[in-house]
C-alpha cells in the first residue's frame, strides 16, 4: 500500500512544491504543466 496525492495548482508553484515533496520523502513525482497537475507518491523513485 502506498501513500499518494494528486494535486491541482498553478504551474508557477510546481517547482517549489516538488522540492518540498522530495524533502518529505515522496519519490514518485509526476507533473503536467499544461494541466496544472502534480502527482506524488511514496512508491519507487521515478519522475514523469
Where would I find each of the regions flagged by the language model?
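Catalytic cores and adjacent binding grooves of peptidoglycan-active enzymes
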Residues: 1-48
Amino acid at each position: 500500500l502506498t501513500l499518494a496525492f494528486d494535486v491541482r495548482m498553478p504551474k508557477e508553484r510546481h517547482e517549489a512544491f516538488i522540492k518540498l515533496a522530495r524533502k518529505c520523502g515522496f519519490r514518485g513525482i509526476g507533473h503536467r504543466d499544461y494541466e496544472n497537475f502534480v502527482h506524488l507518491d511514496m512508491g519507487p523513485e521515478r519522475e514523469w
